[in-house]
A protein has these predicted regions:
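Transmembrane beta-strands of outer-membrane beta-barrel pores
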Residues: 3-9, 105-113, 156-162, 169-171, ...
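Flexible glycine-rich, low-complexity coil/linker segments exposed to the extracellular/periplasmic environment
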Residues: 9-73, 182-191, 237-264, 339
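Extracellular loop and loop/strand-boundary signature of outer-membrane beta-barrel proteins
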Residues: 69-75, 122-129, 190-194, 259-265, ...
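Outer-membrane beta-barrel signature, preferentially recognizing the C-terminal barrel domain
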Residues: 73-77, 160-227, 247-274, 279-282, ...
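Conserved C-terminal beta-signal and adjacent last beta-strands/turns
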Residues: 140, 154, 202, 283, ...
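Gram-negative outer-membrane beta-barrel transporters
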Residues: 222-227, 236, 243-351
Length: 427
């Protein structure tokens, strides 16, 4: 049995900045001037760069707090989760071969609530909304040894992934219309959804492993996940009678149901994929290659998931293809390795204005890292026993991070190469 209680709060104070000599203009003083920044990647050329934070701090701007219009950006979300676990080990014989594994089940009871503001024009009403649900998550894992070096593994499990806490906040903006919407409601709103529940998946995994040497193995894994209750942008209906009573607003027919545009559970689909991996000491090929080795893997993934309206949907963070390769050399405490990872384009989340989270297309990348190190444990130098020194190089090809919105560059960042020199000592 376990219990977890977590709370997330967002406090957003937004100010409108007005230059203190407005409507006159002011040249940027030299002490704040930082040069220029190149914006060629979005077709804007060079742009002035200056220390705007310092200018605010030194009183060049008058700040006006925008309380009402940004009140819905402030909220708190709490979540209490009680979990019960049970597991039993399995040991049996199938077709003359030993099969081991375990079977288990997890029951979770979740109580969540959110306190936030509802807004309509200049009217603000603080509200607390609660929601509770439960989940039952069974699992089965089996392992069959074909011989001393070959193994087959099988797993099936129901899993879940909780919504982001900011998606469950109780804040929204309300508008009352004289004409009903497609749902027959006169009230429209936009904001969070306090009734969001976890995304669910039923996953099946099958893996073949071949340990052909002490430090070598080959493996191929196949997997399939049935996805349900995925979270999309959509519409839900909620009762806003408390808000209407507090503000004195009414609808033409006296109804109190609002159509809220935000995140909703709905739609389902499948995720299928495979992974092939190989680890091999090259001394298996020739004794002159003693100490050399490789590790390589390739992952391929495809998904078929539909939004509630039937449109195709791309899962965030999912690249259709990922390759990774490492070459290493180890000998007498010395170790060197070079790794390269390549992934295709994928969808991802970035913070937008007001710290809202928005989804964009992230371009694929190829990143190379390297490391050399020496462990003095086997050096024969007594006072250096336990010392290990290393030099790391990260992003050696200076791969940029690029995101697109509608085919136009949204964000472009160059991190440059990163080198680290360090040591560790075991007493």
């Amino acid at each position: 049995v376990s219990f977890r209680d977590r709370t997330k709060k967002k406090t957003a104070e937004n100010y409108f900045m007005t230059l203190n000599v407005f409507p006159d203009m002011l040249a940027v003083p030299d002490k704040y001037y930082l040069g220029s920044v190149n914006l060629d990647f979005i077709g804007m050329g060079n742009m002035i760069a200056y220390d705007s934070v310092a200018m605010v701090r030194d009183g060049f701007y008058d700040l006006t707090l925008e309380e009402s219009s940004y009140a819905t950006n402030q909220w708190s979300v709490s979540e209490e989760v009680t979990a019960f676990y049970a597991m039993a080990n399995l040991e049996m014989e199938v077709a003359g071969r030993e099969v081991t594994g375990n079977v288990g089940v997890r029951y979770l009871q979740t109580d969540q609530s959110s306190t936030a503001f509802a807004r309509s024009g200049g009217d603000l009403v603080q509200q607390t909304v609660s929601h509770d649900y439960n989940n039952v998550l069974p699992s089965l894992n089996l392992r069959m040894a074909l011989d001393e070096q070959q193994t087959i593994r099988f797993g099936i499990a129901k899993t879940m992934s909780r919504p982001r806490m900011d998606e469950m906040n109780a804040s929204f903006s309300i508008g009352v219309s004289q004409v009903p919407d497609v749902y027959g409601n006169y009230i429209g709103a936009g904001g969070g959804n306090t009734t969001l529940e976890p995304k669910e998946a039923l996953g099946i995994d099958l893996t073949y492993e071949n340990y052909f040497a002490d430090d070598g193995y080959f493996a191929i894994a196949l997997y399939r996940k049935e996805l349900k209750e995925w979270i999309f942008d959509g519409a839900a209906e909620i009762d806003v009678s408390n808000f209407l009573a507090a503000t004195g607003q009414t609808t033409p027919d006296g109804s109190t149901t609002a159509t809220v545009n935000g995140k909703v559970n709905g739609g389902d689909g499948t995720l299928t994929g495979y992974e092939v991996s190989l680890a091999m000491p090259l001394s298996l090929l020739h004794e002159s290659l003693d100490g050399w080795g490789i590790f390589a893997s390739h992952t391929g993934v495809s998904s078929d998931i539909k939004a509630p309206g039937g449109a195709d949907f791309e899962l965030p963070g999912l690249s259709k293809s990922i390759q990774q390769a490492t070459v290493y050399y180890e000998n007498g405490g010395f170790e060197a390795r070079l790794s390269v990872r390549k992934r295709d384009d994928f969808k991802g989340d970035l913070y937008g204005l007001g710290f809202s989270v928005e989804q964009y297309e992230m371009l694929g990348e190829t990143i190379a890292d390297a490391q050399i190190s020496y462990d003095f444990s086997g050096s024969g130098i007594e006072y250096l026993e336990g010392l290990r020194v290393y030099l790391q190089g990260v992003n050696l090809t200076d791969e940029p991070f690029t995101s697109l919105n509608g085919g136009v560059v949204r964000d472009y960042q160059e991190y440059g190469e990163n080198y680290r020199l360090g040591f560790s000592y075991d007493f």
